[in-house]
Amino acid sequence: QEDDRSSPRYWLFDRENNRLGDFLVVWPEIEETDLSQTKPFKFTNSDGVTLHGYFTEANNFTGEKPPLIVLPHGGPIGPRDFWGFDPDVQILSNAGYSVMKINYRGSGGYGRDFLKAGMGEPGRLIQKDIIEATEGIIEKGWVDKNRVGIYGASFGGYSAVQAPILRPDLFKVGVSLVGLFDLNMDFREGGCQA
């Protein structure tokens, strides 16, 4: 069992006694903690492509509008973000940041054409999707447009460096964890073109 505000929980069915009971709660200590709800959203970019993402409002924020952290997933081709519990998102939210995750072109689960649309486009169309989705969240008035950062790992780490280069007016900070920076190697070995 998993939702967006409780840690993963696994159940065990006892056939002899016909009972269902807890087998494992991954982070039982956070069950009572006030966590933030993650809401799905849709956005149509300037190319007319519908993108899906997830927005988590800042928890415990006092002020006019919270800052935003954009959290692009790795890949880029095939992986995707899902609705559900994400410890990174909850940590950021409880620190007072709203968080946006976007399934850019090339993300899995949206059909072959959507997947292919991201192939060979790690520095262009995929970054365009991330940037335009960020602008879309700002236009909704949910966050402070002057306090936007981006943080990611693997290909998300590449995006966390690329976005502030492409749009320094929009992204005030970028944090890259194990970022993918040798795109030529990744093309040769399969990651970017999948």
Question: Where is each model-derived feature located?
Answer:
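Serine-hydrolase catalytic core recognition
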Residues: 1-194
